[in-house]
A protein has these predicted regions:
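C-terminal interaction-tip segments
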Residues: 1-41, 116-152
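Short, well-ordered loop/turn elements at secondary-structure boundaries
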Residues: 5-6, 57-58, 106
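Residue-level recognition of well-ordered secondary-structure positions
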Residues: 4-5, 9, 63-65, 111
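Beta-rich globular "head" domains
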Residues: 37-40, 47-77
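Acidic glycine-/aspartate-rich tracts in secreted/extracellular proteins
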Residues: 67-74, 84, 115-119
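A cross-kingdom feature marking solvent-exposed beta-strand/loop segments within repeated
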Residues: 40-50, 75-111
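Noncatalytic modules at the cell exterior or secretory-pathway interfaces
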Residues: 62, 103-128
Length: 152
């Protein structure tokens, strides 16, 4: 991967200016959040039962909003690694209907999954919107994943 960037200048994760300037806006709405079917399952949910949001550049900040109504069955969980969103790891946050979460995190991927174990009618628990501010740092420079790191 290093060869790809050897002959040109680019900013990296430690470039302070990339975080001081205004971020490039990025929005995705009506993201269908699938039902996990995994509550109580010690093996966790399958990889197919999650929505993945990929960012083209490293984020400066990210906001996740649960667009569903504040009723039973509209909760979602969000995580910053594929393993984190699973039941067995429980390294996720929960948003009830109409709640949102914002943070200044450097990420290139976000994982969303339905949370309510009693939901049975259909495959979509709720919908979500994601708003992010992008830096000029290419996503490929934040290599790998947060999987395997404590708390993620």
């Amino acid at each position: 991967m290093a060869e790809k960037y050897m002959k040109r200048y680019h900013v990296g994760l430690g470039n302070v200016g990339s975080y001081q300037v205004s971020a490039r806006p990025w929005v995705s709405s009506s993201i269908h959040v699938p039902y996990s079917g995994a509550v109580g399952n010690v093996n966790g949910a399958s990889a197919a039962n999650r929505a993945v949001v990929n960012f083209p550049y490293v984020t400066k900040f990210v906001t996740i909003r649960n667009d569903g109504p504040n009723v039973h069955g509209a909760t979602l969980r969000g995580a910053f690694s594929e393993n984190g969103v699973m039941d067995s790891n429980a390294n996720y946050f929960i948003l009830s209907g109409a709640e949102s979460f914002s943070a200044d995190f450097k990420v290139t991927r976000l994982y969303l999954m339905g949370h309510d174990g009693n939901y049975t009618a259909g495959t979509t628990v709720t919908t979500a919107s994601v708003i992010a501010g992008l830096t000029g740092i290419e996503a490929g420079l934040l290599s790998g994943s947060w999987n395997g790191h404590g708390g993620v």
